[in-house]
Amino acid sequence: MGARASVLSGGKLDTWERIRLRPGGKKKYALKHLIWASRELERFTLNPGLLETSEGCKQIIGQLQPSIQTGSEEIRSLYNTVATLYCVHERIEVKDTKEAVEKMEEEQNKSKKKTQQAAADSSQVSQNYPIVQNLQGQMVHQAISPRTLNAWVKVIEEKAFSPEVIPMFSALSEGATPQDLNTMLNTVGGHQAAMQMLKETINDEAAEWDRLHPVHAGPVAPGQMREPRGSDIAGTTSTLQEQIAWMTSNPPIPVGEIYKRWIILGLNKIVRMYSPVSILDIRQGPKEPFRDYVDRFYKTLRAEQASQDVKNWMTETLLVQNANPDCKTILKALGPQATLEEMMTACQGVGGPGHKARVLAEAMSQVTGSATAVMMQRGNFKGPRKSIKCFNCGKEGHTAKNCRAPRKKGCWKCGREGHQMKDCTERQANFLREDLAFPQGKAGEFSSEQTRANSPTSRELRVWGGDNPLSETGAERQGTVSFSFPQITLWQRPLVTIKIGGQLKEALLDTGADDTVLEEINLPGKWKPKMIGGIGGFIKVRQYDQILIEICGYKAMGTVLVGPTPVNIIGRNLLTQIGCTLNFPISPIETVPVKLKPGMDGPKVKQWPLTEEKIKALTEICTEMEKEGKISRIGPENPYNTPIFAIKKKDSTKWRKLVDFRELNKRTQDFWEVQLGIPHPAGLKKKKSVTVLDVGDAYFSVPLDEDFRKYTAFTIPSINNETPGIRYQYNVLPQGWKGSPAIFQSSMTKILEPFRKQNPEIVIYQYMDDLYVGSDLEIGQHRTKIEELREHLLRWGFTTPDKKHQKEPPFLWMGYELHPDKWTVQPINLPEKESWTVNDIQKLVGKLNWASQIYAGIKVKQLCKLLRGTKALTEVVPLTEEAELELAENREILKEPVHGVYYDPSKDLIAELQKQGDGQWTYQIYQEPFKNLKTGKYARTRGAHTNDVKQLTEAVQKIATESIVIWGKTPKFKLPIQKETWETWWIEYWQATWIPEWEFVNTPPLVKLWYQLEKEPIIGAETFYVDGAANRETKLGKAGYVTDRGRQKVVPFTDTTNQKTELQAINLALQDSGLEVNIVTDSQYALGIIQAQPDKSESELVSQIIEQLIKKEKVYLAWVPAHKGIGGNEQVDKLVSQGIRKVLFLDGIDKAQEEHEKYHNNWRAMASDFNLPPVVAKEIVASCDKCQLKGEAMHGQVDCSPGIWQLDCTHLEGKVILVAVHVASGYIEAEVIPAETGQETAYFLLKLAGRWPVKVVHTDNGSNFTSATVKAACWWAGIKQEFGIPYNPQSQGVVESMNKELKKIIGQVRDQAEHLKTAVQMAVFIHNFKRKGGIGGYSAGERIIDIIATDIQTRELQKQIIKIQNFRVYYRDSRDPIWKGPAKLLWKGEGAVVIQDNSDIKVVPRRKVKIIRDYGKQMAGDDCVASRQDED
């Protein structure tokens, strides 16, 4: 004892006894802690004497540290004590244990760094296999040691892709090159599924690298290294020397570290799959055998301790959902009732070898056969427990029974005195409204006119008879239902009398309980012991099977548990037998069936993170909505989700829930909007009595189609993902969903229809939830009718809150203010601002447009001009002088309040229109002068060039349409245009349209036509033939004219177009002609503009032409077709085309060369894109030094030569499909083969070679492809065989993607064929001949034929070209008289030849070349392939 106590001496012991055990705690270290530590060390066979020195403490800590993570509490306490003791020895000042442990760790980290530094100084060679410097100073590679590889293999074998694998891989691959990393991956290549996932990640990252690091154009400078591509980093297209050079260059490119990072990304994905955090993460790997997947699935399930029911449900849903596509198809075909053994048998051989089959099948049969040990009384997926609320004082946390507050008088439910709550007869199935009454009958009875689809959302228990075996959800109970069944409201506990074993008992109907549990009762028959979990913990019960029980007069037989339960419970096992349902009274309206768009599934959008206060607000809102039956909780079986968020209400601290239904709206069927616009007060007839009502919670009163509810699912997340989110779905029409307005409007119309029929004297205007009710009844009678209407709506579940019930004028309705004999818009205030943003101006224009309905003369054209172009909402826009003036005028107009009157059907409508200038018009519609029904404005220009008459007709049509909508008839028009002007326009203008009856009103400014075009040529006037031409590339152009009197003129223009030059030519003719002129053009565009006689235009050029036309006395404009040999037209065409229009033979060569230098596209793409002959396109490729890599395809690119095919085996429905893809065209040949053997593969290959020219086959390293039989078949058929490179991004890419495509098509046609082999051939036919796209927009079948035919033609042409190449060409440039050459002849056309001089490819006209034979130096004769043309 003394020895142990002497660990610390005097001063140190005082320090020890001042240190607290916990931060802020009262207890401090004492001598007893040292004695305890000594004894513990002895127990762990450590020397207690080590405690006496700081060095000894350090040694103890070194021993204890590795055990802390997995050790017991005692070890942790011992570690803490020793750490504190170390600090005392070292005289480090600490206040408590926590601080001591932190100080200790700091010391350790410092010493560790020192050790590492010392190790680095003493040796320049890493422990693994980095790049090292040899004696000559060269950087050489020290190969990876077998010991390291062995360690890596053991890690994978022992840890099987658990999270520890990643740090171990990182440590073992320190300083590795890509080649080393690939060696490590190849040693564990047997894990096919994992390697496939890793390969996909590497491919993705390599592609991303290439995207972010594009290749620099041009050749690499001498002595400079090329930049690594994605496949170089992955070690597939780079040599070890290149990798070392990159890693050691200055600055270095750490290709090893980059590749290692990619592999770790892939390993992370694999770890997530093999060591999932939750059951939802357990997914089957791409090539993982189904049995291995099941094994992992159940291992995790067993760890989660779920009840057997939950496990069964997971097997049926999650196991199928998360299987790979091959297995999923099979599992779905088996149907929902398949056992686990059936599933595993069916999936045998799919995705890989079934090496665990027998063992696993036996294990699984034991798992599923054994009875579950723990049966939870309630489901595992319940939400948090609801807090108790006191009926008496209203506070949470206690019941009324235990309430200390003075007892409240009267009933706690209805508030009336004279009875207690348990005797209350008041019906309050009130889940949606403040006050829901059913005045026409007893609780739960609806009048006979109300038919209803019995939704399982009425919150009452309804028991259906045994003679009527219906489903639990009540899906079959459509239409009218008799309400004679017992209904039990949930305002009290649903207690009923039951009869069991000849005894009467009182029991609680509990839809939340799985089992029926009764307190001590003697029942006949055998029983077995069982444990069940309830709210208060576990209880022991006796289980009796096949017991008859009578509930509410209906008999059921099932399992009954007997034990010490606080209350008798009838659970779901018996309630479902008697057809008991839980119902909510939302609205007794029939639901409107809704579907998704064909071929679409529901939304699966992830919920984004939300702040804590938003989550709390949403939880409160949703709890309230759930109580009211608007939404219901759902389990994880619903795969759909829509994101939600919360915003604060305007001028309030309350939150509002918003659901982002954009994705669901895209997928939901389209609806026909019942109402096409909003009602207008000018169309209201004058009524004696008026009332305005508002329907409260409008959408939430209408039920949503049951089958559609699942698609409205949303999730409230938890803070820091503490628990799974709470999932809900809507039972009613959601706000923000596209179907809600249409369904609500049609439901409201149906409900109001009987009331409208019974009360024809009452006018009801309905727009969404706003109701305008008018009548000519006395106010007392009118209000009685209003109450009847409110009652009628209430019967259907719609409340009309008093708060929004307007009885006295002025009535605020739809943004209008209604008085008994007049109406106006609600007051409008235009803001005064120093600076205006785009958003401010948008709001301002909106207000002015709204005001223009009754305030005449409002203009917004100049304000709208400020908003042109794409501007940010917050961008400040300076007001132009015109806009400021317009705004000031509008302010003046709005100063005086203006009112409109109501419509009198006995009087005519009159519309008067005035021109305001600047293309703006104002109008008034009235029945009596100076008493406007409404006003408005028109300022739309339907084209760049217009005139007043055209605008006037457009305005009239707008007013006529508006009148038909509001009053059902067109008004008489008073227009500021003379009849003669109108007649002239209407007869001449081919686009003129009908306008209604009208009369002339002399309101200046009058509308007139400013000039007229003649119908016949003007005799004696000069005729101008005009034309214009422009070059699209250079944007240079010419315009001009030729006259019948020999005059001509051509003017050049820059930055122009063909259309502009045509108009420029007309402008020239008008400027240079007299007062009378004939103009002939070949431009339909120019003719169309001028024939419409515009008097204003947005185009400056057209405005100049209008000015010239107004000055003329007579103008005749005619059109002739271009290039048809018409005298003057042909002359002027030649004039303006010179040097502008250039028709060059093969003028795409330069562009093709430029594009090839940038993108190095293949000859076929150039031939297609630039319309070049294949030989010229191939020559461009041949003259490119980067594209000449020994005739092979460039690294990392798929070789698309015509004879190359890729082959691969894929699996579907337990069978093997051998797929061959013609790489260049995407054409497929596929067959179901009996077995994946070399014999079958060789036979398929010979069949393929017999149909198509096969030069090369590219396959993976599968045993069937590497077999001797296939090699023999390839040798016989003269086919070269190539194999894929491991981890090469493009190695088997074409056939892999075709496998997916083929399976997708098979899935689409599978139900049309009995056998898989038939479906495969159908899919091949569809792919080859019914799907078009890619180069040329062909189908794959057309493309392969085209490619093979082109190849044959090219070979033939090549033979001719070899002959042509025996000729040499001497040529002259346009301005240089000296003959150049000899050049090589590439192509001979009709008017030009294509030659190659050094590396330049040129197009030279035939008249400027001399073609001679190489040997003879004489001119080529007529018999030669390239006969000579006449020279200039």
Curated annotation (Swiss-Prot):
Residues engaged in binding Mg(2+) 2: 1027, 1062, 1082, 1133
Cofactor: Mg(2+)
Keyword tags: Activation of host caspases by virus, AIDS, Aspartyl protease, Capsid protein, DNA integration, DNA recombination, DNA-binding, DNA-directed DNA polymerase, Endonuclease, Eukaryotic host gene expression shutoff by virus, Eukaryotic host translation shutoff by virus, Host cell membrane, Host cytoplasm, Host endosome, Host gene expression shutoff by virus, Host membrane, Host nucleus, Host-virus interaction, Hydrolase, Lipid-binding, Lipoprotein, Magnesium, Membrane, Metal-binding, Modulation of host cell apoptosis by virus, Multifunctional enzyme, Myristate, Nuclease, Nucleotidyltransferase, Phosphoprotein, Protease, Repeat, RNA-binding, RNA-directed DNA polymerase, Transferase, Viral genome integration, Viral nucleoprotein, Viral penetration into host nucleus, Viral release from host cell, Virion, Virion maturation, Virus entry into host cell, Zinc, Zinc-finger
Span(s) of short sequence motif Nuclear export signal: 16-22
Region named Dimerization of protease: 486-490, 534-540, 573-585
Catalytic activity entry: Specific for a P1 residue that is hydrophobic, and P1' variable, but often Pro; Endohydrolysis of RNA in RNA/DNA hybrids. Three different cleavage modes: 1. sequence-specific internal cleavage of RNA. Human immunodeficiency virus type 1 and Moloney murine leukemia virus enzymes prefer to cleave the RNA strand one nucleotide away from the RNA-DNA junction. 2. RNA 5'-end directed cleavage 13-19 nucleotides from the RNA end. 3. DNA 3'-end directed cleavage 15-20 nucleotides away from the primer terminus; 3'-end directed exonucleolytic cleavage of viral RNA-DNA hybrid; DNA(n) + a 2'-deoxyribonucleoside 5'-triphosphate = DNA(n+1) + diphosphate
Annotated stretches, region: Interaction with host CALM1: 8-43
Domain annotation RNase H type-1: ranges: 1018-1141
Start and end residues of each Integrase catalytic domain: 1198-1348
Positions bound to Zn(2+): 1156, 1160, 1184, 1187
Positions of short motif Nuclear localization signal: 26-32
Modified residues (Phosphotyrosine): 129
Superkingdom: Viruses
SUPFAM superfamilies with a match to the protein in the record: Acid proteases, DNA-binding domain of retroviral integrase, DNA/RNA polymerases, N-terminal Zn binding domain of HIV integrase, Retroviral matrix proteins, Retrovirus capsid dimerization domain-like, Retrovirus capsid protein, N-terminal core domain, Retrovirus zinc finger-like domains
Interaction with membrane phosphatidylinositol 4,5-bisphosphate: region residues: 73-77
Amino acid composition bias (Low complexity), ranges on this chain: 116-125
Positions bound to Mg(2+) 1: 694, 769-770
CCHC-type ZnF: 388-405, 409-426
DNA-binding region (UniProt annotation): 1367-1414
Region annotated Dimerization/Multimerization of capsid protein p24, chain positions: 274-360
Sequence motif: Tryptophan repeat motif, positions: 982-998
Misc: HIV-1 lineages are divided in three main groups, M (for Major), O (for Outlier), and N (for New, or Non-M, Non-O). The vast majority of strains found worldwide belong to the group M. Group O seems to be endemic to and largely confined to Cameroon and neighboring countries in West Central Africa, where these viruses represent a small minority of HIV-1 strains. The group N is represented by a limited number of isolates from Cameroonian persons. The group M is further subdivided in 9 clades or subtypes (A to D, F to H, J and K).
Its biological purpose: Gag-Pol polyprotein and Gag polyprotein may regulate their own translation, by the binding genomic RNA in the 5'-UTR. At low concentration, Gag-Pol and Gag would promote translation, whereas at high concentration, the polyproteins encapsidate genomic RNA and then shut off translation. Matrix protein p17 targets Gag and Gag-pol polyproteins to the plasma membrane via a multipartite membrane-binding signal, that includes its myristoylated N-terminus. Matrix protein is part of the pre-integration complex. Implicated in the release from host cell mediated by Vpu. Binds to RNA.
Name of protein: Gag-Pol polyprotein
Organism in which the protein naturally occurs: Human immunodeficiency virus type 1 group M subtype D (isolate NDK)
This protein's encoding gene: gag-pol
